[in-house]
Amino acid sequence: MWPLSHRHLCLAFLLVCVLSAISFFLHLYQDSIRHGLGLSILCPDRLVTAPVAIFCLPDTPVSPNTSSPCPQHPASLSGTWTIYPDGRFGNQMGQYATLLALAQLNGRRAFILPAMHATLAPVFRITLPVLAPEVDSSTPWRELQLHDWMSEEYADLGDPFLKLSGFPCSWTFFHHLREQILSEFTLHDHLREEAQSVLRRLRLGRSGDRPRTFVGVHVRRGDYLQVMPQRWKGVVGNSAYLREAMDWFRARHEAPVFVVTSNGMEWCRENIDASKGDVMFAGDGREALPWKDFALLTQCNHTIMTIGTFGFWAAYLAGGDTVYLANFTLPDSEFLKIFKPEAAFLPEWVGINADLSPLWTLAEP
């Protein structure tokens, strides 16, 4: 037998090292497949756990001024929760905030569906990741319809794969996370700057002075004109309510200006008294593209709302004082079975009772 030379020994050692490295990486790859890490190819800088897949929507920038569909979840969270996106802009804001809060409370990962991302991401710097449609369709969901207030059972939901539904928009779900919610619903810079530019141009009509206080006014009209009286035995805010709400602010704030937005701007111009020179009809009333109106409202100091989730969220994000329309249904309304005023309006907000006389007139034989 030929004695091994020093060169042969070195080559043998290198061969053993190469084989060991191949074995190690093969084992690592197999382990990653078992634990779902192969799905991270959709977001190559993130790791996700099977059967969850997240993907970065096309044409989504990754600058600080954008929402991120591929954030990293804390390692302590598990499972997959999502919520069915239903309704319009304010409804989906409520669904997003509720999903985020309940998932955190139960130690679960929260994901939104592409339709919700398409609604909210153009406006806000949201961070919840997006669930791929094929994963949504193949996940063994348990479904749970939420009512619109926090309940004890929602704090102890053991389901690892849960799809929520409903129209939750109650502060009782998420107010303990207020700073996080405000961060999630931070406007993109261009929307905030455009809204502030509009406000900077406003002047008080009589003096020409710049306003000291901006009060956003959201007047919900549209489909509520039929839905409230016919289905819910309720009313929308009328001109008397808006006058009283404005007088409340005039008595408490120096030189306010009222920035009116609505999906019924023509009605507002005809029914809101602007003779004092402190009412500005600034909204464009485009229901399909509500971003500009919403941004305007959130950049004001205070809020007057009538009814609806759009007005709620404008007030919640703006902070300051909020006046809302209170007791806007008859006592026997079916609406009160799904809506609790004490869970809908923050305790410090100020309610002004609605005029229900049109409903009594309708009820007369």
From Swiss-Prot:
<feature type="glycosylation site" description="N-linked (GlcNAc...) asparagine">
    <location>
        <position position="327"/>
    </location>
</feature>
<dbReference type="GO" id="GO:0030155">
    <property type="term" value="P:regulation of cell adhesion"/>
</dbReference>
<dbReference type="InterPro" id="IPR002516">
    <property type="entry name" value="Glyco_trans_11"/>
</dbReference>
<dbReference type="GO" id="GO:1904906">
    <property type="term" value="P:positive regulation of endothelial cell-matrix adhesion via fibronectin"/>
</dbReference>
<keyword id="KW-0735">Signal-anchor</keyword>
<feature type="glycosylation site" description="N-linked (GlcNAc...) asparagine">
    <location>
        <position position="301"/>
    </location>
</feature>
<feature type="glycosylation site" description="N-linked (GlcNAc...) asparagine">
    <location>
        <position position="65"/>
    </location>
</feature>
<keyword id="KW-0328">Glycosyltransferase</keyword>
<dbReference type="GO" id="GO:0001936">
    <property type="term" value="P:regulation of endothelial cell proliferation"/>
</dbReference>
<dbReference type="GO" id="GO:0006629">
    <property type="term" value="P:lipid metabolic process"/>
</dbReference>
<dbReference type="GO" id="GO:0006486">
    <property type="term" value="P:protein glycosylation"/>
</dbReference>
<dbReference type="GO" id="GO:0008107">
    <property type="term" value="F:galactoside 2-alpha-L-fucosyltransferase activity"/>
</dbReference>
<keyword id="KW-0472">Membrane</keyword>
<dbReference type="GO" id="GO:0001954">
    <property type="term" value="P:positive regulation of cell-matrix adhesion"/>
</dbReference>
<dbReference type="GO" id="GO:0032580">
    <property type="term" value="C:Golgi cisterna membrane"/>
</dbReference>
<dbReference type="GO" id="GO:0031127">
    <property type="term" value="F:alpha-(1,2)-fucosyltransferase activity"/>
</dbReference>
<keyword id="KW-0812">Transmembrane</keyword>
<dbReference type="GO" id="GO:0036065">
    <property type="term" value="P:fucosylation"/>
</dbReference>
<feature type="transmembrane region" description="Helical; Signal-anchor for type II membrane protein">
    <location>
        <begin position="9"/>
        <end position="25"/>
    </location>
</feature>
<feature type="topological domain" description="Lumenal">
    <location>
        <begin position="26"/>
        <end position="365"/>
    </location>
</feature>
<protein>
    <recommendedName>
        <fullName>Galactoside alpha-(1,2)-fucosyltransferase 1</fullName>
        <ecNumber>2.4.1.69</ecNumber>
        <ecNumber>2.4.1.344</ecNumber>
    </recommendedName>
</protein>
<dbReference type="GO" id="GO:1903672">
    <property type="term" value="P:positive regulation of sprouting angiogenesis"/>
</dbReference>
<comment type="pathway">
    <text>Protein modification; protein glycosylation.</text>
</comment>
<feature type="topological domain" description="Cytoplasmic">
    <location>
        <begin position="1"/>
        <end position="8"/>
    </location>
</feature>
<keyword id="KW-0325">Glycoprotein</keyword>
<dbReference type="GO" id="GO:0005975">
    <property type="term" value="P:carbohydrate metabolic process"/>
</dbReference>
<keyword id="KW-0443">Lipid metabolism</keyword>
<keyword id="KW-0808">Transferase</keyword>
<keyword id="KW-0333">Golgi apparatus</keyword>
<dbReference type="GO" id="GO:0010595">
    <property type="term" value="P:positive regulation of endothelial cell migration"/>
</dbReference>
<comment type="function">
    <text>Catalyzes the transfer of L-fucose, from a guanosine diphosphate-beta-L-fucose, to the terminal galactose residue of glycoconjugates through an alpha(1,2) linkage leading to H antigen synthesis that is an intermediate substrate in the synthesis of ABO blood group antigens. H antigen is essential for maturation of the glomerular layer of the main olfactory bulb, in cell migration and early cell-cell contacts during tumor associated angiogenesis. Preferentially fucosylates soluble lactose and to a lesser extent fucosylates glycolipids gangliosides GA1 and GM1a.</text>
</comment>
<comment type="similarity">
    <text>Belongs to the glycosyltransferase 11 family.</text>
</comment>
<keyword id="KW-1133">Transmembrane helix</keyword>
<dbReference type="Pfam" id="PF01531">
    <property type="entry name" value="Glyco_transf_11"/>
</dbReference>
<dbReference type="GO" id="GO:0021772">
    <property type="term" value="P:olfactory bulb development"/>
</dbReference>
